[in-house]
Design a protein with these regions (language model features):
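Fe-S-dependent hydro-lyases/dehydratases of central metabolism
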Residues: 2-767
Length: 767
């Protein structure tokens, strides 16, 4: 797919095959035109990504990587579960720098003391195990990492999907918590060598075009076709030099929405200056691809042709130019409404036509926030646009969240905050809430434009089960400010004549020195961890049985199922430290009956674990077991497990939160069945929680099973042990109907984790 403008000019063009890049600038498709003795395989070793992965690979096989990261980072939705898992698995000390930020629930007043209890847990763990603790309001996770952690040629693993520091020369990856646990226990991150896709930047952005515009254009061209799925995006080309460090960072953080694995950029003097400004000159490293580098594909981005963009509800890939939307309002809004019928399952009435006022599109809210929008240059540009204007005294509201206190301080000093506030803007502290529904939830049926990372259904905080719906569209800070200056009528920043001051950034290191706890890697075993009453240990989990019987308790036919749908974000996340408490919200917005169904089936497994009869605990099992015993009379006590599974076409897009899998697990989930998995990280989460990542080739519209059916998987343990690619299973009805379930590629360690029942059991067994 390519994105074209009227007149045939390309904003984005995708190459159908692999390409060679000569001297970082010349694109060559035909190997015969490459004047070099290098083979394709040798030239592939000249990518920046290959070099960094090689330096961090602890195995002798570059096709099967075993990666050790330099640093780790987590926020307060995930660090409690990670540390609790690591503690249960033998943690004694953080073996590498591990930063714990508190940027997700620091403003939530849900559940009394539970949020601050988690923060105190984090602080005492940082002291006990030798970590870094960033208090609430000081910085969002990724801005702190950019300012204080990133380094040229380094690798960072974070328990947040937007862990991306490629613009600074750092390969960063976002994964579920169990992958961080492995690093904390001196184990490795095991993956196949990923493909590498060149993102070739050419030209220079027009005045008023920002990083989110470029990012959305790339996402729109690559998400649906999976062009960069689970691959590394490597940014090259002459256009890189025409972008500031902040601009590059703003594009880079959004690469997650393409479903890529990681990103890396060539670096130059502008990145050196970034490190100099932050007092870390020694962490800069010049990075460039080799003279002849081979890539598995190439995305050509003509920066000069990028226009102000908007990602309409309910996905970052649902992109249009703002001019295109304004010129075709009724048609595009109707198309969005039709797509929403699928996303929302008809749970509420959804219409955008009432947003058209006097032929213009009116929005009720604008927000610039978080790791994507809250950067210094974004907010300075917004202040330049709105200076001397005002947002009006009607429905429209405008909020800005600087991504860190050092940024906030500099914006105060240079007058940008005053310009914003005078215009009616509300300026708040560093907080991720607008990105995931923990603050600034719009009114019912309201429309919000945001420079944040995602606009999935209900991610802004509305509750379908209460009959609520509001919408978020993603835009760049500049066009959001232009819309604010126009009192809520959608306006691209290029439509305004603005003098951008281009103010220089100064970093005040004393802000963090005064407030951030840094152990400098020194652990203090004498410190007692503070446990609030909501912080619970993980429940015991059984090993994979010889034979497995699972009931399908949810069936989702959307093209993609997000992790937000599997476990909602927002205020729900306050219960993140209580596995069973959080699980009560699993699939609550997508399939409210899921939890009840799963818990009902779980009664049988609990009976088995108590050495009681599962049929007595769950009467509906009797005819199911009778049918199984006709063919498999030996199946029963001591060799059978009973639980639940869900089917989804393509689950796992979005967040790295492990809770999308662990909540299913603690409710008795043994497996997922999918046509494919949206991301590597969600599949890894399933595996690390001992769940079978089954796949079926059968189209979702003609499945051999349905919600409520039981599926019997005989000798499943043997199949995993013997590395079977296809597992025989049976849908239990009037007869046993045979089906094939694929397991996909699994490492030996992943197989053992599944056999042991979860990562915690695996490490306990290997002590």
């Amino acid at each position: 797919m390519s994105l074209k403008l009227k007149g045939g000019r390309y904003m984005i063009k995708l190459y159908d095959n692999g390409v060679y890049l000569l001297n970082g600038t010349e694109i060559v498709e035909d190997a015969g035109n490459v004047q070099t003795p290098l083979t394709k395989e040798e030239a592939a070793k000249n990518t920046m990504a290959y070099g960094i992965l090689k330096e961090h690979n602890t195995s002798s096989d570059m096709e099967r990587l075993q990666i050790r990261f330099d640093k780790l980072t987590s926020h307060d939705i995930t660090f409690v579960g990670i540390i609790q898992t690591a503690r249960a698995s033998g943690l004694e000390k953080f073996p590498m720098p591990y930063v714990l930020t508190n940027c997700h629930n620091s403003l939530c007043a849900v559940g009394g003391t539970i949020n601050e209890d988690d923060h105190m847990f984090g602080l005492t763990c940082a002291k006990k195990y030798g970590g870094v603790y960033v208090p609430p309001h000081q910085a969002v996770i990724h801005q702190f990492a950019r300012e204080m952690l990133a380094g040229g040629g380094k690798m960072i693993l974070g328990s947040d999907s937007h862990t991306r520091y490629g613009a600074l020369g750092t390969m960063a990856m976002g994964e579920g918590g169990p992958e961080l646990v492995k690093q904390l226990l001196n184990k490795t991150y095991d993956i196949k060598m990923p493909g590498v896709i060149a993102i070739y930047l050419d030209g220079e952005p027009a005045k008023g075009v920002g990083p989110q515009d470029v990012a959305l254009a790339i996402i729109g061209a690559t998400f649906k076709n999976g062009y960069v799925n689970n691959k590394v995006m490597e940014f090259v080309g002459p256009g890189v030099s025409n972008l500031s460090a902040d601009f590059r960072i703003g594009i880079d953080v959004m690469t997650t929405e393409t479903t890529c694995l990681s990103s890396i950029w060539r670096t130059d003097e502008k990145i050196r200056e970034f490190y100099d400004i932050h007092g870390r000159s020694e962490d800069y490293k010049e990075l460039n691809p080799g003279a002849v580098a081979y890539y598995d594909g190439l995305v050509y981005v003509n920066l000069s042709e990028i226009k102000p963009m908007i990602a309409m509800p309910f996905h970052p890939s649902n992109v249009y130019t703002i001019d295109e939307l304004n010129a075709n309002l009724a048609d595009i809004l109707h198309d969005v409404e039709q797509k929403a019928l699928v996303s929302l399952d008809g749970a509420v009435d959804y219409s955008l036509q009432d947003k058209i006022k006097n032929g213009k599109f009116y929005v009720e809210q604008g927000i610039i926030a978080g790791c994507a929008g809250g950067g210094f240059e974004n907010i300075c540009a917004a202040a330049d646009i709105i200076k001397g204007k005002n947002i009006g005294a009607d429905e429209f509201t405008f909020s800005v969240y600087p991504a860190s206190t050092p940024i906030y301080m500099e914006l105060v000093k240079n007058g940008a905050i005053a310009d914003l506030m005078e215009a009616g803007t509300v300026v708040k502290t560093a907080f991720c809430g607008p990105c995931f529904g923990a603050g600034d939830t719009p009114a019912n049926n309201a429309f919000s434009i945001r420079h944040t990372t995602r606009n999935f259904p209900n991610r802004e905080g509305s509750k379908l089960q209460s009959g609520q719906i509001s919408s978020v569209a993603l835009m760049d800070a500049r066009s959001i400010a232009a819309t604010a200056a126009n009192k809520g009528f959608l306006t691209p920043a290029t439509a305004l004549d603005v003098e951008y001051k281009g103010q220089k950034y100064h970093f005040d290191k004393n802000i963090y020195a005064n407030r951030v706890f840094d152990s400098k890697g020194v652990a203090d075993p004498s410190v007692e961890i503070k446990f609030g009453p909501n912080i619970k240990d993980w429940p015991a989990m059984s090993a994979l049985p010889q034979n497995l019987l699972v009931k399908v308790v949810s069936e989702i036919h959307d093209p993609v199922t997000t992790t937000d749908e599997l476990i909602p974000s927002g205020e729900t996340s306050s219960y993140r430290s209580n596995p069973l408490g959080l699980a009560e919200f699993a699939l609550s917005r997508k399939d409210p009956a899921y939890v009840g169904r799963a818990k009902e089936v779980q009664k049988a497994q609990k009976a088995i674990e108590a050495d009681e009869c599962p049929v007595e605990a769950l009467e509906e099992l009797k005819p199911v077991m009778d049918k199984i015993h006709e063919t498999y009379p030996e199946v029963g006590k001591g060799n059978l497990g009973v639980g639940s599974t869900i089917f989804a076409v393509k689950p796992g897009d979005g967040s790295a939160r492990e809770q999308a899998a662990s909540c299913q697990k603690v409710l008795g989930g043994w497996a997922n069945i999918a046509n494919e998995y949206a991301t590597k990280r969600y599949r890894s989460n399933l595996i690390n929680w001992g769940m079978l990542p089954f796949m079926t080739d059968t189209d979702h519209e003609s499945l051999p099973f349905k919600n409520g059916d039981y599926i019997f998987v005989p000798d499943v343990r043997k199949a995993v042990e013997e590395k079977a690619a296809v597992v025989k299973a049976y849908v239990v009805g009037d007869e046993l109907k045979e089906i094939d379930l694929k397991l996909g590629d699994l490492t030996d360690a992943e197989r053992q984790i599944i056999l042991d029942g979860c990562l915690i059991n695996y490490y306990r067994a290997t002590k």
